[in-house]
Amino acid sequence: MATYLMFGRYTMEGLKGITAERSDKAAALLKKHGGELKAGYALLGKDDLLLIAEFPGTEQAMKASLALTKLTGITFLTSPAVTMAEFDKLAKDT
């Protein structure tokens, strides 16, 4: 499974629904799309939260990102990520 970083920004609508139950629903939604929530963090700065998730592929990650926005009112920027060891191997192979 591939790792994806999901940076979230609260909208006014999204701020109204902050609950532990919504967080549980979000994790279940990722699972419904073939993913697994590995970690979640609240942030200070231009982004308000970070979800680290694994998905089988880009299609599942994109669908989950869109579904999360519909569920929560939070906008997400979702990016694939590789470990530094994977990156070093890719760099060596070029």
What does each model-identified segment do?
Residues M1-K31, E36, L44-D47, V82-T94:
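Short S/T/G/P-rich N-terminal loop/turn motif that feeds into the first structured element of a domain
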Residues L37-G40, F76-T78:
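Generic structural signal for residues in well-ordered beta-strands
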Residues P56-A85:
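An amphipathic, aromatic/His-enriched active-site/gating alpha helix that lines ligand/cofactor pockets
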Residues Y4-R9, Y41-A64:
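Short, well-ordered beta-strand segments in beta-rich or mixed alpha/beta enzyme
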